[in-house]
């Protein structure tokens, strides 16, 4: 027969399970996703990401952060502030927020190239930082296409057939042969101008020259040189471009690329900016090069990272924005965002919710070539 105590729930268990809550701050948002009973409305769907939770909410915060950059960028400068433009060593006018865009080479290999080209075409960003592959793949795509494949294709069979794999993208090796045919005469001309006219080449000057030579409006760097947007690539020799420069050095030696002048260029872009924003797709060199330039001004005002890297191995690629705050690369009062996601999925949606909504404000007479 049960006693009275055996019929009562233990007080400790009740207290643990039914613990009362303190009130949350009044402004705390409620979780709520998109209701498809409203029909298919993509703008409303993306807006609902903010209150969906997880990486959808981080995406919503990234939209807010980029829109804050754009709002400040479009603010008119005072006469005194406008005079700082001469100090940046750039042919671009100073704005209320200088936007740095960094991206790894695989994104140019992918269809994100077209999204980046759109931003550059319409003067929406001020400084680009990428790797060698992020430069050469743009030009190679003007000469021959990249194809869709599968992640699972076997390397041995691809190598036997002269096909290179980038994730689930395929690049025939003939594309690089076409790239060599196009590039070698330009390298000859660069050496000639260096020796006869005293031209001091830097990676950014070389990229601008190649953008002019390709003369193709599908190219990111065609628009970059046309809109005087500097492209910094301190590791420019680490890829097919480096292979071609290496081969060329046997045929016509002497080409010199000065990375120190470019270092001064990117750092002064940050130092003399009224405000700065960083949008960084992927990690590695492009992430750190932009962040380190912003150290020169005690940190960026705005920052958005999009990558899938984790911080637990201590890599810069995986480091959260708060680590950059500790180094003075993002300001202590900033509200940076990291979206843990594949940029090929997220970045076009981010542009759709930010820059693309304000295209007329950036370029009243649209560049369409």
From Swiss-Prot:
Presence of keyword Disulfide bond: no
Catalytic activity: [eIF5A protein]-L-lysine + spermidine = [eIF5A protein]-deoxyhypusine + propane-1,3-diamine
Keyword line: Hypusine biosynthesis, NAD, Phosphoprotein, Transferase
Pfam family, one: DS
Modified residues (Phosphoserine): 78
Database matches in Gene3D superfamilies: Deoxyhypusine synthase (3.40.910.10)
EC number: 2.5.1.46
Listed pathway(s): Protein modification; eIF5A hypusination
First-tier enzyme category under EC: transferase
GO function term, MF aspect, one: deoxyhypusine synthase activity
Cofactor(s) required, per the database record: NAD(+)
GO biological process: glucose homeostasis; positive regulation of T cell proliferation; spermidine metabolic process
Residues that coordinate or bind NAD(+): 105-109, 131-133, 137, 238, 283, 308-309, 342-343
SUPFAM superfamilies in the cross-refs: DHS-like NAD/FAD-binding domain
One annotated Gene Ontology cellular component of this protein: cytoplasm
Residues annotated as catalytic: 329
NCBIfam families hit by this protein: dhys (TIGR00321)
Family per record: Belongs to the deoxyhypusine synthase family.
Protein function: Catalyzes the NAD-dependent oxidative cleavage of spermidine and the subsequent transfer of the butylamine moiety of spermidine to the epsilon-amino group of a critical lysine residue of the eIF-5A precursor protein to form the intermediate deoxyhypusine residue. This is the first step of the post-translational modification of that lysine into an unusual amino acid residue named hypusine. Hypusination is unique to mature eIF-5A factor and is essential for its function.
UniProt name for this protein: Deoxyhypusine synthase
């Amino acid at each position: 027969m049960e006693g009275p105590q055996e019929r009562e729930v233990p007080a400790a268990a009740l207290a643990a399970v039914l613990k009362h809550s303190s009130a949350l701050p009044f402004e705390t948002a409620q979780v709520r996703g998109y209701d498809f009973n409203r029909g298919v409305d993509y703008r409303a769907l993306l807006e609902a990401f903010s209150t969906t939770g997880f990486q959808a909410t981080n995406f919503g915060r990234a939209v807010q952060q980029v829109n804050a950059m754009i709002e400040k960028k479009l603010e008119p400068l005072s006469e005194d502030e406008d005079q700082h433009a001469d100090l940046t060593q750039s042919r671009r006018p100073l704005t209320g927020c200088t936007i740095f865009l960094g991206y790894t080479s695989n994104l140019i290999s992918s269809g994100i190239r077209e999204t980046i080209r759109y931003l550059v075409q319409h003067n929406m960003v001020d400084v680009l930082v990428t790797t060698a592959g992020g430069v050469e793949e743009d030009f190679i795509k003007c000469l021959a296409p990249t194809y869709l494949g599968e992640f699972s294709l076997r390397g041995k069979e691809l190598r036997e057939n002269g096909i290179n794999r980038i994730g689930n993208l395929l690049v025939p090796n003939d594309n690089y042969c076409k790239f060599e045919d196009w590039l070698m005469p330009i390298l000859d001309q660069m050496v000639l101008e260096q020796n006869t006219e005293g031209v001091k080449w830097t990676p950014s000057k070389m990229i601008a020259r190649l953008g002019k030579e390709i003369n193709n409006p599908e190219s990111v760097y065609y628009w970059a040189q046309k809109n005087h947007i500097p492209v910094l690539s301190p590791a420019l020799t680490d890829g097919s471009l480096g292979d071609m420069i290496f081969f060329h050095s046997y045929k016509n030696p002497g080409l010199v690329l000065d990375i120190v002048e470019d270092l001064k260029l990117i750092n002064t872009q940050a130092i003399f900016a009224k405000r700065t924003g960083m949008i960084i797709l992927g990690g590695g060199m492009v992430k750190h090069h932009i962040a380190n330039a912003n150290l020169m001004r005690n940190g960026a005002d705005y920052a958005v990272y999009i990558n899938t890297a984790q911080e637990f191995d201590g890599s810069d690629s995986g480091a959260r924005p708060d680590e950059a705050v500790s180094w003075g690369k993002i300001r202590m009062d900033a509200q940076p965002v990291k979206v843990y996601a594949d940029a090929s999925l997220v970045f076009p949606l981010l542009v759709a919710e930010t820059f693309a909504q304000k295209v007329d404000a950036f370029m009243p007479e649209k560049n369409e070539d």
